[in-house]
Amino acid sequence: MYTKIALLGLVGSAAAFNAPMMTVRRDAIATGAAAAVVAPMLRPAGAAMKKDSKAPCVEVFDERDGCKAAGTQKASGDDGFCVKVSMKAIKMNAAEATSVTKNYNTKLL
């Protein structure tokens, strides 16, 4: 008896949540129309490329040449190095480019 009541309850709840076909079709058409409006906005833009051919150049300066005082041997995190990063224009070298294209994909040994 209880199993029949539970089964009827499950069937009744499933029937209550079943949406009519008309609303499903209407929602599908509205979703398709919204996608057609938004689709042109989702196209990827072309990547912007700078024409100045600059690349980061890293320079490391070292002051550990024996000029330090005798009392500065503690581990303070100051190791006497300085790092400079700057953007520099890279010049085109036609001979180097020809060498790379000529020797590309060849065995060195």
Curated annotation (Swiss-Prot):
Instruction: Write out the residues that bind (2R,3E)-phycoerythrobilin 3.
Output: 64
- Pfam families per the UniProt record, alphabetical: Phycoerythr_ab
- Locate the residues binding (2R,3E)-phycoerythrobilin 2: 63, 67, 72, 74-75, 84
Q: Name one GO biological process term.
A: photosynthesis
Q: Tell me where on the tree of life, at the top rank, the source sits.
A: Eukaryota
Q: Where in the cell? A: Plastid, Chloroplast thylakoid membrane
Keyword entries, A-Z:
Bile pigment, Chloroplast, Chromophore, Electron transport, Membrane, Photosynthesis, Plastid, Thylakoid, Transport
Give the main location: plastid
What job does the chain carry out? Light-harvesting photosynthetic tetrapyrrole chromophore-protein from the phycobiliprotein complex.
Instruction: Kindly give any further remark recorded in the entry.
Output: The light-harvesting system in Cryptophytes contains phycobiliprotein complexes. Unusually they are composed of either phycoerythrin (CPE) or phycocyanin (CPC) but never allophycocyanin (APC), with only one type of biliprotein being present in any one species. Unlike cyanobacteria or red algae these proteins are not arranged into higher-order phycobilisome complexes, and they are found in the thylakoid lumen.
Listed under subunit, the entry gives: Heterotetramer of 2 different alpha chains and 2 identical beta chains which form 2 alpha-beta heterodimers within the heterotetramer. The two alpha-beta heterodimers are rotated to an open configuration in contrast to the closed configuration found in other cryptophyte species due to the insertion of a single amino acid, Asp-65, in a conserved region of the alpha chain. In the open form, the central chromophores are not in physical contact but are separated by a water-filled channel.
Task: Give the family from UniProt.
Answer: Belongs to the phycoerythrin family.
Kindly provide the name given to this protein in its UniProt entry.
Answer: Phycoerythrin alpha-2 subunit
The organism of origin for this protein: Hemiselmis andersenii (Cryptophyte alga)
